[in-house]
Each structure stands twice: as structure tokens, then as C-alpha cells.
């Protein structure tokens, strides 16, 4: 792909690709830590599109991973090149814990269901070996660990590690093993996975904490925070008043509604101004003092449901 390619062009192509392959897509949010959200059945994607995948920093990546875990979404970077070379097709790269692939690789996954097998890492390109298949076929050929190791020009210990899932193989070694055994032994990489929760901070936050919600504050998103129901795991995208005027709140309601529809989450404004109606452009409004009178997260969600249709 030409180095002069514009990010906007790649982003538009990815958006069109998703829409034409059965995904419900959000608007594009270029000033956010993520560019768009897309859903197809149970698969929810949180995408960042870059020309140079090294352009993402650790803080942006952390926020993307946090949101992905909260929404049970798969974070992914689609990029054209790194700072040193173009991204290769059907190879998975990684930046700050987020998988990164070339547009062609992403297209293969979305349109054709073909997933990459090769991982780019320090020192070269690697694959995951199907250890069970490797052991079964080796034994069918009556080959010992040492026999197969000698044929593949690796150590007996290396073959043992492959069979027990203790090591990745270089792409070259995997190819040699497949030629020897006449069978595919490499595994496709599932990059549509949800990040682990061990690094995610869900902070108790005032009145919401009292009724069973944790709050995840965001810094570079089209919304202010995400409230996570601790007991039942429901998610609510939240905008706070922050002394914003009615016109600004109406403008902010558009991405709130858009993202809540795609993510399957609830959305709400939490504000102090008593003059604001109970609904802004289809988004329910709850006053801060009302939360103090609620007894549970269920009551909070019930009020949201009731106020969706308020005029």
C-alpha cells in the first residue's frame, strides 16, 4: 500500500467493509481513543485505524482495552505500516496489548472468515502449534521425539514443548514439520477476544456506588464515563452535566445514542440542573439527587427505561 495513503481513506474503507458484511456500525469518532464500534451478532469490535501503528501510545491503548473489557468487545488496530516497514498480510502484530493487522488481513477475517496464523514478535515471525495433533501424527508415524527433532533440525526438548503448548514455533520450523508429517499443525489466532479484567479499574463513585455501580472514567471518548453494574454486569454509558448548557447536552446525545445502540448498553445523562427535562434527544436524564433516593441498581435501570420515551 502506498505510503502516502491517508488515514481517512483507510478508515472509510474499513467502515464500508464492516457495513457490507453484516455489521451494525457506529459513526466514526476520529477525536476519540477509538474510531468506531461495530457489532455482528455477539461479536462487538472496538477499532482504531492508523497509518502507522506505532502512533498509538500506552495511555490510549489502556483506555481502549478498558472500554473493550467493559463492553465485552474485541479491541483491534488496523494499520498500514509500522515505523520500520509495511504490515504483512495474514500476520498479527501487537501494540500495547492490542492486536494490530493490515487492512487486507482484516478484510480476510471479516469477509471470508480466514484468520491469520503468524505472529510478529521480536526476533521474527512465530506460530502456535496444535500440540495434540503434532503428538498424534508423530506417534502414527512411529517417530520418537528425537526422531522428529532430528528431521526438523531442532532439539528433542523443543518438540516436547510444542506438543505440550509450552513454546511457539518459528514460521520456518512449523513449515518443515508440516512437510514432514504432511498435515497442518498450526493454529489460527483468535484476535477477536476480550481483554482480561486484571488491569481494569472500576472505581466506586459516590451515589452510584451506593446502589451497586462502579464508575470507569474516560478521557478521550464521546462520553464522560461508563457505569458498570457490579452484581449483574450491566453497562451504562454516561454523560455528566459539568455545567454544560442545553445545546451542548443535545449535541452530546447523538453519539451517546449511537454507541449505546451498537454496544447494547443503556445510556443516561446524570445532571444537577433541575430545569433540564427528563429526556434529551431520546437519552434519559436522571438528576444527581434522585440517585440518592434510589435503593438499588435495578431501580436506577428502571428509571432509565421509563424515561426513554419521555418528551
Curated annotation (Swiss-Prot):
Keyword terms, alphabetized: DNA-binding, Transcription, Transcription regulation
DNA-binding region per Swiss-Prot/TrEMBL record: 145-164
A molecular function GO annotation: DNA-binding transcription factor activity
A Pfam family: HTH_3
Keyword Plastid: no
Domain HTH cro/C1-type stretches: 134-192
Name the UniProt record assigns to this protein: Putative HTH-type transcriptional regulatory protein MTH_967
Organism name: Methanothermobacter thermautotrophicus (strain ATCC 29096 / DSM 1053 / JCM 10044 / NBRC 100330 / Delta H) (Methanobacterium thermoautotrophicum)
